Amino acid sequence: MNRRTDADSWDPASSVGATATMVAASRARASRGPDALLDDRLAEPLVRAVGLQPLVRMIDGDTAVDDPPSSPRSLNEQIAVRTRYFDDFFTAAGAGGIRQAVILASGLDTRAYRLNWPSGMTVYEIDQPQVIEFKTRTLAEFGALPCPDHRPIGIDLREDWPSALRQRGFDAGQPTAWIAEGLLVYLPPEAQDRLFDNIAELSTPGSQVATEHFPDPNGFSGPRAQRLSERWRRMGLDLDMAELIYHGDRNTVIDYLADHGWRVRARTFEEMHAHNGFEPPDDEMMALFGGMSYVTGIRK
């Protein structure tokens, strides 16, 4: 795997795109069985269409690797917590009267298709052109229908995506709900700031944003993350988090939002597990994600 560059691109089977497919595979696993933790019936056909066989075997339960991060309980619960958090964010925003939603770096996210959006909601999705084209085409072939006003936009978030958003009819004068899920570590530090500056510029008072805070994103290149990458390689998947993320000091998202006109609330990884009725995560999962917080901001 090659290290990231400022002009790199990907599809759902390569680089950062493959991590989105891995997350979709985890959602597919968590959506199975009588005690399913999620209800994402579109994740599995997307993963199968991408065709990365290690991830197809993962959703089929045909993996023999048994280090702690691959534990079905810990992995499925972590994905369920994360997915439910952002699902609930959009549901609450819609119930509160917001009628514009923007999913940044949407990957194989299926919320435009599976959430019960209120009447009049416009849902925008932004991601790499190859990712957007693959997902919309595959789900159309599968017979899945998005919400009535679904506007996917194929553009790199390092480019002038605000102009592309406006060109598709986005109204900066109306409150908007934004999510940046599983995104920030894949942006250079300065691009993270620019992302939130653009969101702020496009957000009227009452708009909301949800994202994640990692106190030390560089921890993804530590020994435990290296063991996780080794596990993926044994599965046949050439993914190395140390090569995919951007390193270096970056502003703390909680403080940055608070300093730029947002009222911020953060809930810890452990708190959200308890909120969803799960036992505390195991030690290996805590080592990777334990310092993480789920963050919501409301524009003042």
From Swiss-Prot:
Spell out the InterPro entries in the cross-references.
Ppm1/Ppm2/Tcmp, SAM-dependent_MTases_sf, SAM_mthyl_Trfase_ML2640-like
- Which GO molecular-function terms appear in the entry? methyltransferase activity
- Its EC number is 2.1.1.-
* Top EC class for this record: transferase
Return the Gene3D superfamilies for the record.
Vaccinia Virus protein VP39 (3.40.50.150)
Q: Does the keyword Transferase apply?
A: yes
Q: Where does S-adenosyl-L-methionine bind?
A: 127, 156-157
Q: Which domain of life is it from?
A: Bacteria
Which residue ranges does UniProt annotate as crossing the membrane?
none
Q: GO terms for biological process?
A: methylation
Could you list this entry's UniProt keywords, alphabetically sorted. Answer: Methyltransferase, S-adenosyl-L-methionine, Transferase
The free-text function statement in the UniProt record for this protein reads:
Exhibits S-adenosyl-L-methionine-dependent methyltransferase activity.
Indicate the family of this protein.
Belongs to the UPF0677 family.
Q: Which PANTHER family match?
A: S-ADENOSYL-L-METHIONINE-DEPENDENT METHYLTRANSFERASE YKTD-RELATED, S-ADENOSYL-L-METHIONINE-DEPENDENT METHYLTRANSFERASES SUPERFAMILY PROTEIN
Q: What is the protein name given in its UniProt record?
A: Putative S-adenosyl-L-methionine-dependent methyltransferase MMAR_1058
